A protein has these predicted regions:
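Flavin (FAD/FMN)-binding glycine-rich loop and adjacent Rossmann-like elements that form
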Residues: 1-178
Length: 178
């Protein structure tokens, strides 16, 4: 069996100046159920409303530094400064979050290969903050994975139906890639 440590180790063990005084083994980076999506102009790919959409639509993370509002928003807390930061995504212009972890830029392929760019969604808005997968009972881990998937589907649904962008429109053209 391989020995391992999770979370934040105490300063007395590591000598790191920013380490906490006491060990915090449950203090782990959130996990994310990523998904791929593309944008096909003129088509409507709106998914069915996820079961937990109402919860995730209203969810405000209880973290320090504080998150600036709802998780499903184009605003997030910068991880370094903690200051509210605006995010944008414009699949037509290929800017902002749309290019972050983009899988395929249709401009780099023979015309017609892809109807639109394909982007992998691993954004601050779908980081699951309500529990860990490590060192928890299997049933608890499965519940966290289910809820993380609900969060990711809720983010997609929010973008398709409620999210406003600079040009004041939602994007039902965003398609979930199976």
């Amino acid at each position: 069996k391989t020995e391992y440590v999770t979370g934040a180790e105490p300063q007395k063990d590591t000598g790191e100046p920013h380490a906490p005084a006491e060990a915090a083994p449950r203090n782990m980076q959130s996990f994310t159920c990523c998904f791929a999506m593309d944008y096909v102009r003129g088509e409507d790919h709106t998914i069915e409303k996820p079961r937990e959409y109402a919860f995730w639509r209203e969810f405000v993370p209880a973290i320090k530094p504080p998150w600036p509002g709802r998780l499903l928003s184009w605003e997030y807390g910068d991880p370094i400064s903690g200051k509210p930061t605006k995010l944008e995504t414009d699949p037509e212009k290929g800017t902002g979050l749309w290019t972050y972890r983009r899988i395929a830029d249709k401009a780099l392929f023979v015309e017609g290969t892809y109807p639109g760019d394909i982007s992998l969604v691993n954004w601050p808005q779908n980081d699951y903050l309500l529990g860990n997968l490590c060192d928890v009972p299997e049933k608890e881990a499965a519940q966290h994975i289910f809820r993380a998937k609900q969060l990711s589907l809720s983010l997609l649904y929010w973008m398709q139906t409620e999210a406003r962008r600079k040009f004041n429109a939602t994007v039902p053209q965003i398609a979930f890639e199976n």
